[in-house]
A protein has these predicted regions:
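Nucleotide-activated chemistry modules centered on ATP-dependent adenylation/adenylyltransferase
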Residues: 12-14, 22-240
């Protein structure tokens, strides 16, 4: 029996191999092991597949690029209509482009940006504006960005697509992978399983951010997360 009755990803032979015990004995998928299995398969064949990597920001991308560029030819896709305000969006784009230009990588890395249209984000989360951070509003935002990524990966003829989002301790890696798998089936392009916070990926991203002097934002990106950050800052200030 596979994890929680779910069907295997197309890259996998035995799904149970990638499962580990979670809280209360629940089975959890180890997406890092799945990724390592895919990498090993291509290395044994002497292949360097192509990957469309959705990027949320430079700090989160730093470790992911350092890691994956050893094994893939990467096109970084910057599509984040959730980011508010526009000045913040522009700052994050510039930092990502600077990182790509400065970081040494084994295989080619290119960059493509889809224009800023905050209306796409607000339409996607309509009716869920008041849902707390980490809930359904965020899941809809995941889906919006991942769907555009899957669509473009198919158009470009890429071997795989994935996102940097799972490196964050605040992002739901299981949900990200489930959505990616579903969209991969819809658009007939392979979703690369990933949980980049594994193997101390998040810690490494902090180190690389310091090394390259990257701007590290203090909120996820959307207006709702910005308001929540400002609210918490106000509470902290009053308590001091």
């Amino acid at each position: 029996m596979g994890c929680r009755g779910r069907q295997p990803l197309r890259e996998c032979v035995r799904y149970d191999f990638f499962c580990e015990k979670g809280a209360a004995g629940m089975q959890k998928v180890n997406y890092q092991k799945m990724l390592e299995g895919i990498i090993k398969k291509h290395e044994e064949k002497g292949e360097v597949p192509t990957l469309l990597l959705h990027s949320c920001c430079a700090p989160c991308s730093s470790y992911v690029l350092e890691y994956l560029s050893q094994y893939f030819k990467i096109t970084v896709f910057y599509y984040n209509p959730n980011i508010y305000p526009r000045e913040e969006y522009d700052k994050r784009v510039a930092e990502l482009q600077r990182l790509i230009a400065q970081m040494p990588m084994k295989n080619p890395v290119t960059f493509v940006e889809r224009g800023y249209d905050e209306g796409e984000f607000f339409q996607a989360v309509k009716g869920f504006e008041d849902i707390p951070e980490g809930g359904e509003r965020c899941f809809r935002c995941y889906r919006l960005r991942l769907e555009r990524t899957a669509q473009l990966a198919k158009e470009l003829g890429m071997d795989y697509f994935t996102t940097t989002l799972s490196i964050s301790p605040y992002k739901n890696a299981q949900k990200l992978n489930e959505i990616s798998e579903e969209l991969g089936e819809v658009y007939d392009v392979k979703a690369l399983p990933a949980d980049f916070k594994k193997r101390e990926g998040y810690k490494r991203s902090v180190q690389l951010s310091a090394e390259y002097g990257l701007y590290r934002q203090d909120y996820c990106g959307c207006i709702f997360s910005k308001r929540e950050r400002e609210r918490l800052d106000t509470i902290t200030t009053k308590s001091e």
